[in-house]
Amino acid sequence: MCSSDLAPCGVRSLSRWHRDHPYEMDAGGQHFSVGYLPADSDSGMFGGNSNWRGPVWTPVNLLIVRALLQFHLYYGDDWKIECPTGSGRLMNLFEVAREIGARVASPFLRDAAGRRAVYGGAEKFQTDPHWRDLILFYEYFHGDNGAGIGASHQTGWSGTVAKLIQLFAYLTPEAALRAHDMRPMMSTYGA
């Protein structure tokens, strides 16, 4: 997993590498450029709702985790990759899946200062005792800082972070290699 693809809160929808290396083309006498944007679109290109150029989407990360677990069943513990790229850390695919799962869950957890990344600069949700523990499941997340963006009641897909937490709380790498141990848990989140 390239470090420019991996955000603090999961895998970005478009690599941060494209911030400095946008995709560019000329068509119909016009110049088009698509680069990394960690949050909402900065132009009307593609209708203006181009929030696929950098934010983190929970359902995509869930599919990546599922695929990594499936490949881990085939390759086992001995097949390792560097994650993130350039870190020098070698991980098997189960460990990479668990790393992504932990990153997806991280915006909802309090940091050392008691703040949740999901709430960004929304002080009412960060500090008010009546609101600070009411977790909102946003549509997607800022690709650089994990702040929730878009609709704030997307429990249909961002709420699936609970399944990732549950999965990695109970599933061990050893159990993952015994496919029959994993199937009941995998089936509960769409496998």
Regions found by a protein language model. Give the residues of each.
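Acidic, mature catalytic/reactive cores of soluble proteins
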Residues: 1-191
